[in-house]
Amino acid sequence: MQITPDNIIFYQYQFVVINATLVYTWLTMALLVIGAAWVTKKLVVRPKLPPWQNFLEIVVDGIYQHIAEVTQQEPEPYLAFVGTLFLFILTANLLTVVPGYQAPTGSLSTTTALAIAVFIAVPIYGIRQRGILGYLKSYLQPTPIMLPFQIIGEFSRTLALAVRLFGNIMSGNLLAAILLALVPLFVPVAMNLLGLVFGVIQAYVFAILALVYIASAATVQEKKQSISMEENS
């Protein structure tokens, strides 16, 4: 059993390397895109909905409600990005029940790419909510001396997101490999079930942390506005 999918090489020619991380990442994305296209064509608006549509509506509504609870804002601006992050990580982790499949989230390159996507999304959402000047001013608060620390904080949060997901998935794979070597008959079934639960939790935690980072700028702005209104009153 491989601890990380980076070690599984499917093709290599000079500096071109196609490993399991790349293959299974694209496979996961392809499944999500094809599934989304199929679902979009099959959606119905009738009193009696098919079971799969009921299930998907429950999932989307759950994501919607969690965004509203965490951000205390309208969920629509965050739903597509955060929902995509959650569904990608969830699908990548749940596919581990397929023999031979290795979750791409067990590779630091994949988790770093996801963290960089969040890193880029933070200023995009911040500028959209507060304007470019308002967002840039947040790096100078409460004093301009904090500017280098604010910048370091942005990079450290990105690094923490990447390393946290990678470390948790890799440690889970390592634990499964150790237990499989000790008790090869009964452990695989139990570890598969535990891995499914673990994968759901990791997808949820990563999405929530990303949501908190993205929404923090607008939340701070709203708090400052409410404080100033109270002082004026």
From Swiss-Prot:
Q: Which domain of life is it from?
A: Bacteria
The listed locations are: Cellular thylakoid membrane
Membrane-crossing segments per the record:
15-35, 78-98, 107-127, 169-189, 194-214
List, alphabetically, the InterPro entries matched.
Alt_ATP_synth_F0_Asu, ATP_syn_F0_a_bact/chloroplast, ATP_synth_F0_asu, ATP_synth_F0_asu_AS, F0_ATP_A_sf
Does the keyword Ribonucleoprotein feature in the UniProt annotation?
A: no
Q: Name one GO biological process term.
A: proton motive force-driven plasma membrane ATP synthesis
Describe its membrane topology: Multi-pass membrane protein
GO CC annotations?
plasma membrane-derived thylakoid membrane; proton-transporting ATP synthase complex
State a single Gene Ontology molecular function.
proton-transporting ATP synthase activity, rotational mechanism
Q: Which UniProt keywords apply?
A: ATP synthesis, CF(0), Hydrogen ion transport, Ion transport, Membrane, Plasmid, Thylakoid, Transmembrane, Transmembrane helix, Transport
Instruction: Give the quaternary structure.
Output: F-type ATPases have 2 components, CF(1) - the catalytic core - and CF(0) - the membrane proton channel. CF(1) has five subunits: alpha(3), beta(3), gamma(1), delta(1), epsilon(1). CF(0) has four main subunits: a, b, b' and c.
NCBIfam families for the chain? altF1_A (TIGR03306), ATP_synt_6_or_A (TIGR01131), PRK05815.2-3 (NF004481)
Say which family it is in. Belongs to the ATPase A chain family.
Function of the molecule: Key component of the proton channel; it plays a direct role in the translocation of protons across the membrane.
Q: What is this protein called?
A: ATP synthase subunit a 2
In which organism is this protein found?
Answer: Picosynechococcus sp. (strain ATCC 27264 / PCC 7002 / PR-6) (Agmenellum quadruplicatum)
